[in-house]
């Protein structure tokens, strides 16, 4: 009985630890952008991916059609993976992004919580939320 109780307690701890990952990644990205806003905004308006890649917490940067797409972190293995990052939208409008690409424009996004969500034809989910100025947080679940 004691071994079962210990096993159950460990299972509960590990399952709860996994539940906070999304909110923690989001909070970390908001903090990263807010703490480095001057550097990030200058690099984005100049389309300077190299300057962004120098910041701690940024893993990969893509420049496409005037957008700067920044990957920060991810977890899981498909079909239950999640990527997190932020992007610079030159027109200030939210979009759905994934893997360095823009998936859809504002007109295909649906309001959800403090942001917008896009569901593609599969079971993939893309969420975006305004951080400041032309900068938006994103998460992609696939």
Regions found by a protein language model. Give the residues of each.
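Sec-dependent N-terminal signal peptides of Gram-positive bacterial secreted proteins and lipoproteins
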Residues: 3-21
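N-terminal export/targeting and maturation segments
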Residues: 19-78
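Residue-level detector of functional hotspots within protein domains
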Residues: 2-5, 26, 121
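Extended hydrophobic/Leu-rich segments
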Residues: 8, 52-55, 116
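Extracytoplasmic electrostatic interaction patches
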Residues: 64-142
């Amino acid at each position: 009985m004691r071994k079962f109780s210990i096993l159950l307690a460990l299972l509960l701890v590990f399952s709860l630890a996994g539940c906070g990952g999304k909110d923690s990644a989001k909070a970390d990205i908001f903090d990263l952008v807010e703490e480095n806003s001057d550097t990030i905004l200058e690099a984005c308006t100049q389309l300077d991916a190299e300057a962004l890649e120098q910041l701690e917490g940024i893993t990969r940067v893509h420049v496409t059609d005037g957008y700067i797409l920044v990957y920060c972190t991810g977890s899981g293995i498909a079909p239950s993976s999640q990527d997190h990052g932020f992007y610079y939208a030159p027109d200030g409008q939210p979009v759905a992004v994934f893997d360095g690409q823009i998936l859809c424009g504002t007109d295909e996004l649906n309001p959800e919580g403090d942001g917008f969500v896009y569901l593609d034809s599969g079971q993939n989910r893309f969420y975006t939320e305004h951080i400041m100025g032309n900068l938006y947080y994103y998460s992609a679940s696939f």
